[in-house]
Amino acid sequence: MVTNINQLNLNKLYTYADYLLWQFSERIELLRGKIFKMSPAPNMRHQSISGRLFGELYVAFRDKKCRLFSAPFDVRLPQKGKADEQIYTVLQPDICVVCDPEKLDSRGCL
């Protein structure tokens, strides 16, 4: 079990399957298998803008089939297959709009 990001080889490529095993407090994203550290907590201005934008989007999509999510929310971008071992990109956008319910599962968006 990996409990600290310093236990990982940052030159190695990782998958979503690896990501699910990590239990450290640092926020990260995977981009083509590479680990990218996210800022620990967005500043107040960022949160204020993000909150206002989420509110506007909520109103715009209220009567549509689209659903809105805010971070932390895993967005997995598969290239070859949908198995956890085949996914090398996992992002956590501030706001995510998903209009295809087939892309949602208990772990986020695929």
Where are these predicted regions, by residue range?
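Gly/Pro/Ser/Thr-rich low-complexity, intrinsically disordered segments predominantly at protein N-termini
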Residues: 1-110
